[in-house]
Amino acid sequence: MLLAIDVGNTNAKFALFRGAELLARWRIATDDRRTADEYMVWLDQLMRIEGYDRGDVDAVIISTVVPRALHNLQLLAHKYFGVDALVAGREPVTWGIALKVDEPQSVGADRAVNAIAAQAVEPGRDKLVISFGTATTLDHIGPDGAYLGGIIAPGVNLSLEALVAAAAKLPRIAIEAPASASVIGRTTESQMLIGVYWGYVAMIEGLIARMKAQIGKPLVVVATGGLATLFQEQAHLFDRIEPDLTLNGLMHLYNQGQQKI
């Protein structure tokens, strides 16, 4: 089995694959101080609950946007699974797609991995991948899978946190889809929720429209990321929602590498 690990700024996702089949997935808060031993205690318990044994894992692949978290995850792979982890974007792992931007070395591993996964599900078409996480990214992927650039915007939670941090009398609230379509709130909390949620929807609508106009070709819009389901009721925004896009991209990246050996 393959253990795929995707470390984001907020959460780290772990998944088991057999071939192309996603068997199980788990999530833990990102903490670059967490040791290999701590990871294993947590992961071993969850694997056992779902009927898997760590001895069945024969490969590990990691994508991370938190460089300081990498060492302990590599140690996890070596110490507890007896393998050297492959790291997305580092030798001997090659992307297998072109990064057609001015600074290809600056493209986040998660965005390149998402491009690989999007190409697997929508080959031969122009794609717009929107990843809702700590930051929200919108990326144009060409018909051949090439990464062609994109946008980075503050994530919806980050926007809410900035509002609360800057305005002393505003309460801390959880982001969720408003209970109604009304955009006139009658409490402070509802007004905040309306402003952040519907303001964010308007931003995404506007950015999609601008990207479509500039690209000038039909686009398949794919949503992913930990907060993508927050906007699932806004069906007009996306053609498909793929919560596991990055994990599946790691699986495809590993499998295409194996074919070259």
From Swiss-Prot:
Pathway: Cofactor biosynthesis; coenzyme A biosynthesis; CoA from (R)-pantothenate: step 1/5. Its EC number is 2.7.1.33. Keywords: ATP-binding, Coenzyme A biosynthesis, Cytoplasm, Kinase, Nucleotide-binding, Potassium, Transferase. It is found in: Cytoplasm. ATP binds at residues 6-13, 134. CDD domains: ASKHA_NBD_PanK-III. Substrate binds at residues 108-111, 188. SUPFAM superfamilies: Actin-like ATPase domain. It comes from the Bacteria. GO terms for biological process: coenzyme A biosynthetic process. One of its GO terms (cellular component) is cytoplasm. It catalyses: (R)-pantothenate + ATP = (R)-4'-phosphopantothenate + ADP + H(+). Disulfide bonds: none annotated. Its main location: cytoplasm. The keyword Transferase applies. A monovalent cation. Ammonium or potassium. Its cofactor is NH4(+); K(+). The keyword Transmembrane helix does not apply. The active site is at residue 110. InterPro entries: ATPase_NBD, Type_III_PanK. One of its GO terms (molecular function) is ATP binding. Catalyzes the phosphorylation of pantothenate (Pan), the first step in CoA biosynthesis. HAMAP family: Pantothen_kinase_3 (MF_01274). Belongs to the type III pantothenate kinase family. Homodimer. This is Type III pantothenate kinase. It comes from Sphingopyxis alaskensis (strain DSM 13593 / LMG 18877 / RB2256).
